[in-house]
């Protein structure tokens, strides 16, 4: 089925006069940049007579509930937090149509929305860049300028069916959970950076000046000096184990870049049905510092302690619990994780 979808998605998507767009935004995210961007986009929608609903929601649980109801084919709901409704189509007009969600935000908001989608087959997903990360938008070639991105979406949309990942993990207390991701999931060094950055007070200040990346660079250098590696057993597509005495980090990626444009997996193809895995073992600090710098030049694979694999799934079992991230979000520490590639993310850009 997905092969057929991929073929059809290469055709241009043409809208009709009954198309409905559900714009989703956290108005307080990225130091309030979202509100400013919306003020730029709203006149474009009004001028073109576009039917839309803006769901501006600061409460994560409320947003999750709204997305679940929308994508569960149940559009008769109360839009808590909605601040704009323009020329909304009737229930009869849209009940048999796909739901089109447009996320105004960064990778964190996109991850939250994607994990809340009930029916992927009948949900189209678009995004407009807001925030300091935006790795998903960068990976799939979405315009950096929000106004240009919206105009492209309205005038010349293209649908692509992409892969996504799913991380099934065992927490320290033995409980099992899972989360989907659109970019990457990793444990070790990159997850430690995400965890520390999520609690960084200075990040909020730097985001105001569009300098959020500096936080990740600073924390990245700090973590090289401070983190403790762990023993690990790794299984690729059920085969193994590959025993690693000092795991620095392992990341399973759908796309090339994570962490604000870091190309850990430069050959990743988001339409091949497989994850690209970058695995790094511990090394002397000077070597690690050099490797991290060389990642930006895509030269990190020249080092003997860095390996690349391609697989449908990877299972990682660690001796010491490690932080895990999915698209930069760090829910907990884990004892083991299975990262798997899935298909069926309908991106419209």
What is the predicted role of each segment?
Residues 35-37, 114-117, 138-140, 263-264:
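Short amphipathic alpha-helical segments
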Residues 27, 104-106, 128-130:
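Glycine-rich beta-strand-to-loop/alpha-helix junction loops that act as flexible
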Residues 34, 236-238, 263-349:
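ATP/nucleoside-binding phosphotransfer catalytic cores, i.e., glycine-rich phosphate-binding loops
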Residues 65, 112-113, 135-136, 192, ...:
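Phosphate- and divalent-cation-binding pockets in alpha/beta enzyme and binding domains
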Residues 190, 249-265:
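Glycine-rich phosphate/pyrophosphate-binding beta-alpha loops
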Residues 48, 57, 119-248:
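Catalytic core of DAGKc-family lipid kinases
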Residues 1-101, 111, 115, 148-151, ...:
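ATP/NTP phosphate-donor binding region
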């Amino acid at each position: 089925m997905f092969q057929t979808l991929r073929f059809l998605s290469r055709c241009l998507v043409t809208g009709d006069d009954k198309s409905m767009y559900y714009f989703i935004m956290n108005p307080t995210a990225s130091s309030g940049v979202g509100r400013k961007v919306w003020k730029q986009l709203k006149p474009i929608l009004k001028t073109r007579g576009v039917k839309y609903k803006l769901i501006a929601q600061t409460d994560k649980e409320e947003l999750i509930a709204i997305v679940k109801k929308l994508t569960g084919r149940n559009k008769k709901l109360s839009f808590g937090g909605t601040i704009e409704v323009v020329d909304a189509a009737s229930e009869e007009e849209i009940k048999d149509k796909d739901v089109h969600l447009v996320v105004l935000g960064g990778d964190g908001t996109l991850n939250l929305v994607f994990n809340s989608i009930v029916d992927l087959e009948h949900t189209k997903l678009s995004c407009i860049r807001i925030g300091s990360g935006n790795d998903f938008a960068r990976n799939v070639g979405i315009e950096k300028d929000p106004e240009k991105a919206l105009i492209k979406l309205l005038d010349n949309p293209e649908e692509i069916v992409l892969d996504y990942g799913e991380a099934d993990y065992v927490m320290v207390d033995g409980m099992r959970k899972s989360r989907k991701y659109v970019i990457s999931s990793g444990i070790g060094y990159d997850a430690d950076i995400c965890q520390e950055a999520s609690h960084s007070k200075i990040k909020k200040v730097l985001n105001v000046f569009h300098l959020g990346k500096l936080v990740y660079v600073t924390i990245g250098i700090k973590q090289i000096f401070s983190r403790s590696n762990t023993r690990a057993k790794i299984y690729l597509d059920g085969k193994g184990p590959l025993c690693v005495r000092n795991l620095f980090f392992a990341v399973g990626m759908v796309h090339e870049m994570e962490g604000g444009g870091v190309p850990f997996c430069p050959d990743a193809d988001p339409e091949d049905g497989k994850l690209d895995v970058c695995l790094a073992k511990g090394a002397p600090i000077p070597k690690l510092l050099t490797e991290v710098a060389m990642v930006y030049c895509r030269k990190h694979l020249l080092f003997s302690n860095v390996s690349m694999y391609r697989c449908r799934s990877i299972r990682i079992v660690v001796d010491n619990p490690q932080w895990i991230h999915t698209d930069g979000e760090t829910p907990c520490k884990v004892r083991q994780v299975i990262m798997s590639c899935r298909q069926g993310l309908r991106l419209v850009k």
